[in-house]
């Protein structure tokens, strides 16, 4: 159990740092499009979780430390529903209703599509 906790913690740090770096880069280069970082990490995270899920279905012998570390730790640290919610609220509060609705729709449906695509890649 300790090894699983360590794997989740270490991978979570990596995912969180990648999300932070993505947000910092987008803020520095495209401050008007602050929501793009959250959208990007969430869609990429969905793709990654689809691939990992598919791989782990094919390889059930992969140790729990690796499975939990990658899915719960790395992908959990990388993706964020709370930032998505805040970004959407900020867009709504600034009167950008069509953009907020588009962002929410792309986030949800794009995430589902990316997860499906990731899983499908493991079935080729």
From Swiss-Prot:
InterPro entries: FluC (IPR003691). Na(+) binds at residues 76, 79. GO terms for cellular component: plasma membrane. The keyword Ion transport applies. Na(+) is not transported, but it plays an essential structural role and its presence is essential for fluoride channel function. GO terms for biological process: cellular detoxification of fluoride. It catalyses: fluoride(in) = fluoride(out). It is a multi-pass membrane protein. Pfam families: CRCB. It is found in: Cell inner membrane. The chain crosses the membrane at residues 5-25, 38-58, 69-89, 99-119. Keywords: Cell inner membrane, Cell membrane, Ion channel, Ion transport, Membrane, Metal-binding, Sodium, Transmembrane, Transmembrane helix, Transport. Belongs to the fluoride channel Fluc/FEX (TC 1.A.43) family. Fluoride-specific ion channel. Important for reducing fluoride concentration in the cell, thus reducing its toxicity. This is Fluoride-specific ion channel FluC. The gene is fluC.
């Amino acid at each position: 159990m300790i090894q699983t906790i360590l794997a989740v913690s270490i991978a979570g740090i990596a995912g969180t740092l990648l999300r932070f770096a993505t947000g910092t880069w987008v803020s520095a280069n495209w401050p008007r499009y602050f929501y793009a970082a959250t959208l990007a990490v969430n869609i990429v995270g969905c793709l990654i979780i689809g691939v990992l899920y598919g791989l782990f279905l094919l390889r059930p012998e992969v140790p729990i430390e690796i499975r939990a570390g990658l899915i719960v730790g790395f992908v959990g640290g990388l993706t964020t529903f709370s930032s998505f919610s805040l970004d959407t609220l900020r867009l709504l509060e600034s009167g950008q209703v069509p953009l907020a609705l588009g962002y929410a729709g792309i986030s949800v449906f794009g995430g589902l599509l990316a997860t499906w695509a990731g899983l499908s890649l493991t079935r080729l």
